[in-house]
From Swiss-Prot:
Family from the record: Belongs to the Antp homeobox family. Deformed subfamily.
SMART domains: HOX
Pfam families xref list: Homeodomain (PF00046)
GO cellular component: nucleoplasm
Annotated protein name in UniProt: Homeobox protein Hox-B4a
Keyword field: Developmental protein, DNA-binding, Homeobox, Nucleus, Transcription, Transcription regulation
Single annotated GO MF: DNA-binding transcription factor activity, RNA polymerase II-specific
Gene Ontology terms: biological process: anterior/posterior pattern specification; embryonic skeletal system morphogenesis; positive regulation of transcription by RNA polymerase II
Record organism: Takifugu rubripes (Japanese pufferfish)
Motif (Antp-type hexapeptide): 139-144
Gene name of this polypeptide: hoxb4a
Localization: Nucleus
Keyword Transmembrane helix: no
InterPro entries named in the record: Antp_homeobox_Deformed_sf (IPR050609), HD (IPR001356), HD_metazoa (IPR020479), Homeobox_antennapedia (IPR017995), Homeobox_Antennapedia_CS (IPR001827), Homeobox_CS (IPR017970), Homeodomain-like_sf (IPR009057)
Length: 288
């Protein structure tokens, strides 16, 4: 029915597709003499790829991939497909080769990738591809260290001094609350606070040292870092207290035991009364 309607239509223009004389069904397989097939039957050891696969023509047509978009756009509805996927024109029509159609088909096919350069090896390409696909780590604002002093890029001197760390309000609030309960931190507690506030242990230690010095200054407490000997001499000179007087105390043995006392004895009173060292009740030179 399709062939009759195709031949009746006189206004139909000849289809344009590439030459297919060599793909026709009659010329697809070469014509051989009967002796050629008889010679092949006599040689069973020869390799025959067609004998390995026995398929029906309809099954083979289903297994073949569908025709490409280029063939679909250039052929009419009445064109017959061969089992091999080639286009067969209807009988009675003369086909003319059209170079434009072939050029259009070539443009549809993708171009192969360019070959790698001589200096670049496949190993280097494989090593560079994971680095390019690796994502940069995400850095949040609270993870960045804020510094007050910023060294300019034109600075050519020696190594600049360590910049002062500016703590955020939240960090200062947490540190003040911890200092309110504990003025001295243990190592374990210092590590916990450092992880919580995203600071280093050294920063926590220095902050508590400075905070303790400020607290002592506000409460007017003496500095504990000064030597104890110099502190005692300075306090005696400034206050004007007398030096302690050593008085003997009787003991069980003959040796004398002295105890300090702040009372200074009056020599004139002892001389006038005529008291002797032997009459003094607290002095004993030997056993009784």
């Amino acid at each position: 029915m399709a062939m009759s309607s195709y031949l009746i239509n006189s206004n139909y223009v000849d289809p344009k597709f590439p030459p297919c004389e060599e793909y026709s069904q009659s010329d697809y397989l070469p014509n051989h003499s009967p002796d050629y097939y008889s010679s092949q039957r006599q040689e069973p050891a020869a390799f025959q790829p067609d004998s390995l696969y026995h398929h029906h023509p309809h099954q083979q047509q289903r297994a073949e991939p569908p025709y490409t978009q280029c063939q679909r756009a250039g052929q009419p509805a009445s064109v017959v497909m061969s089992p091999r996927g080639h286009v067969l024109p209807p009988s009675g029509l003369q086909t003319t080769p059209v170079p434009e159609q072939s050029h259009r088909c070539e443009s549809v096919t993708p171009s192969p990738p360019p070959p790698p350069s001589c200096g670049q090896t496949p190993h280097s390409q494989g090593a560079s591809s994971p680095a390019s696909t690796r994502k940069d780590p995400v850095v949040y604002p609270w993870m960045k260290k804020v510094h007050v002093n910023i060294v300019s890029s034109n600075y050519t001197g020696g190594e600049p001094k360590r910049s002062r760390t500016a703590y955020t309000r939240q960090q200062v609030l947490e540190l003040e609350k911890e200092f309110h309960y504990n003025r001295y931190l243990t190592r374990r507690r210092r590590v916990e606070i450092a992880h919580t506030l995203c600071l280093s242990e050294r920063q926590i230690k220095i902050w508590f040292q400075n905070r303790r010095m400020k607290w002592k200054k506000d409460h007017k407490l003496p500095n504990t870092k000064v030597r104890s000997g110099s502190t005692n001499t300075n306090s005696q000179v400034l206050t004007g207290f007398p030096k302690p007087h050593w008085t003997p105390i009787a003991g069980r043995d003959t040796c004398m035991i002295y105890a300090p006392s702040l009372a200074v004895p009056d020599c004139e009173t002892e001389c006038r009364s005529g008291s002797h060292a032997s009459d003094h009740p607290s002095l004993h030179f030997g056993p009784e």
